C-alpha cells in the first residue's frame, strides 16, 4: 500500500494553516505559491476577495537576475513588499500555503521583511 504522498501532505498542511489565518483590509494575507521552477506571491484581502499586490519570478526584471532560485525568490519578496507599501499596506500575515518554511519560501519572507513589510 502506498503512502499518502507529498502533495496530499502539503494540502493537509495548507488546510490546517488556512483554518487559523485570514487577511483583512488592514492586515492582508501574503500568499506564497511555489512550483518547481517559479514563485508566485500575492497580497490578498480575504474580506473583499481582492488581490492588492502581486509579484512572481516570471517578471522580466526578476528573470534577468543572475543567481539561483533562492536569490530570485528573495527579490520577489522585495518586489511584493514595495508594491504593497505603494498600496498603503504596512503589515501582512504570512501564508506559506502548506509549504515548509525553508529555502525559497523563507527567502520570500526575508525579502518582504527587508522591503519594509511587517510579517
UniProtKB/Swiss-Prot annotation:
Keyword line: Ribonucleoprotein, Ribosomal protein, RNA-binding, rRNA-binding
Ranges in coiled-coil conformation: none
Top-level taxon of the source organism: Bacteria
InterPro entries, A to Z: Ribosomal_uL18_bac-type, Ribosomal_uL18_bac/euk
An example Gene Ontology molecular-function term: 5S rRNA binding
Gene Ontology CC terms: cytosolic large ribosomal subunit
One of the GO BP terms on file: translation
The keyword RNA-binding is annotated on this UniProt entry: yes
Pfam families reported in the protein's UniProt record: Ribosomal_L18p
SUPFAM superfamilies: Translational machinery components
Function field: This is one of the proteins that bind and probably mediate the attachment of the 5S RNA into the large ribosomal subunit, where it forms part of the central protuberance.
Family as reported in the entry's similarity comment: Belongs to the universal ribosomal protein uL18 family.
Self-association and partners: Part of the 50S ribosomal subunit; part of the 5S rRNA/L5/L18/L25 subcomplex. Contacts the 5S and 23S rRNAs.
The protein, known as: Large ribosomal subunit protein uL18
Native source species: Micrococcus luteus (Micrococcus lysodeikticus)
Gene name per UniProt: rplR
Amino acid at each position: 500500500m502506498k503512502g499518502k504522498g507529498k502533495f496530499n501532505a502539503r494540502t493537509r498542511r495548507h488546510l490546517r494553516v488556512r483554518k487559523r489565518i485570514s487577511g483583512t483590509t488592514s492586515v492582508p494575507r501574503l500568499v506564497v505559491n511555489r512550483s518547481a521552477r517559479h514563485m508566485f506571491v500575492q497580497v490578498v484581502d480575504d474580506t473583499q476577495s481582492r488581490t492588492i499586490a502581486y509579484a512572481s519570478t516570471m517578471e522580466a526584471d526578476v528573470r534577468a537576475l543572475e543567481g539561483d532560485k533562492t536569490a530570485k525568490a528573495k527579490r520577489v519578496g522585495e518586489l511584493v513588499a514595495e508594491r504593497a507599501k505603494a498600496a498603503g499596506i504596512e503589515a501582512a500575515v504570512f501564508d506559506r500555503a502548506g509549504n515548509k518554511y525553508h529555502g525559497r519560501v523563507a527567502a520570500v519572507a526575508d525579502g518582504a521583511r527587508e522591503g519594509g513589510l511587517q510579517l
